[in-house]
């Protein structure tokens, strides 16, 4: 999709008014929830997980992404450069390779008028010869935001504790909040009233699932998760989802039977079975995930909703989903991938430009 060159820093004024939704309190059960409202006007607010946000805040973030998409697609001319990232640098600290996250983040920063500075593991000290804490102290003194893609979630927690600017989680082994914003935007584009619909996750229990399940719960979407017995959802993550589901009245269930998970499902989702760093486990995982491939046959056997749709955050392997489904009209995969851009714009607009303020 071609993007207008003039769409730059002033996007914030176009996006400023988003409908208010019912607010609920955020549940914080584990970890250092660094993105709580700042204790002082000068303290940064970080975005490390969907669990860091109240339901109202998360809905506002998705609405902002939706408005960003509408502004770009309709060719609206932003009114003023002073409200964006003009004159600001966003450090993109990636210890893992990336396609969608890197491209969407760099593009989002550029649209908002800022300078994206990519810092890979071979460019700077990322816990090698210098502590992450010290690295964060130094880099945050020179930039306006750090977008970090790391391994252990503890790494991004250290970065956020030391940082004097907002830190946005671009992926950790525990959470992937930008993907969750993307996925809920995609879901609500296809199901305008998602409360009460069912999403089935078929595959590995991983970071994408955890934030997506929390996000679904905040929207009142029922979630059914099917994983092999050897790869259950960790109890602490399951509790986070249950807490959010309790507040919204939605349901969360787990099973080891894919057919049970997809019964009545409006959306079927899967992800990679072998994440980065798990290559040595590939042969074993392929055996243990036998029967978990998403296919039309699985949906039929399980009794999925007749109009079910399919999602996958990419990259995809054929053992995870058949070509028949992946490239079918049921598939939302490529619109979902495009929506990563609008999620990145919304996150930067909220946590950097507005300093974590979700009001109108």
Feature names for model-found ranges:
Residues 305-309, 313-360:
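Adenosine-phosphate binding glycine-rich loop
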Residues 136-139, 144-215, 312:
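Anion-binding alpha/beta catalytic cores of soluble intermediary-metabolism enzymes, centered on
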Residues 1-37:
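N-terminal mitochondrial targeting presequence
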Residues 89-142:
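Active-site cofactor/substrate anionic-group-binding motifs, chiefly glycine-
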């Amino acid at each position: 999709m071609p993007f207008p060159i003039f769409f730059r820093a002033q996007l914030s004024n176009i996006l400023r008014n988003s409908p208010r939704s019912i607010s609920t309190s955020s549940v914080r059960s584990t970890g250092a929830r660094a993105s709580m409202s700042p204790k002082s006007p000068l303290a940064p607010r970080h975005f490390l997980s969907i669990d860091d946000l109240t339901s109202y805040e998360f809905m506002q973030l998705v609405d902002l992404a939706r408005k960003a998409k509408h502004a770009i697609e309709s060719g609206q001319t932003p009114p003023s450069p002073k409200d964006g990232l003009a004159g600001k640098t966003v450090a993109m600290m990636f210890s893992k390779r990336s396609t969608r996250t890197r491209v969407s983040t760099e593009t989002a920063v550029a649209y908002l008028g800022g300078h994206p500075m990519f810092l890979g593991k071979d460019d700077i000290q990322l816990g090698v010869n210098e502590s992450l804490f010290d690295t964060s102290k130094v880099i945050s003194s020179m930039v306006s935001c750090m977008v970090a893609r790391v391994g252990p979630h503890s790494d991004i927690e250290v970065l956020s504790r030391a940082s004097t600017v907002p830190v946005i989680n671009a992926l950790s082994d525990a959470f992937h909040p930008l993907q969750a914003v993307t996925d809920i935007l995609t879901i609500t584009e296809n199901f305008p009233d998602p409360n009460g619909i069912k999403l089935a996750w078929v595959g590995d229990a991983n970071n994408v699932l955890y934030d997506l399940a929390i996000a679904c719960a905040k929207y009142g979407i029922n979630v059914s998760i099917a994983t092999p017995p050897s790869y259950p959802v960790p109890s602490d993550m399951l509790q986070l989802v249950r807490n959010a589901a309790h507040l919204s009245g939605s349901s969360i269930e787990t099973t080891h039977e894919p057919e049970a998970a997809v019964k009545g499902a409006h959306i079927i989702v899967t992800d990679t079975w072998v994440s980065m760093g798990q290559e040595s486990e590939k042969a074993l995982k392929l055996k243990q995930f036998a029967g978990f491939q998403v296919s039309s046959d699985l949906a039929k056997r399980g009794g999925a909703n007749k109009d079910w749709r399919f999602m996958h955050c990419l990259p995809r392997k054929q053992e995870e989903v058949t070509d028949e489904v992946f490239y079918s009209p049921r598939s939302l995969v490529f619109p979902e991938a495009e929506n990563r851009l609008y999620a990145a714009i919304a996150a930067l607009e909220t946590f950097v430009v507005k300093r974590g303020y979700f009001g109108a």
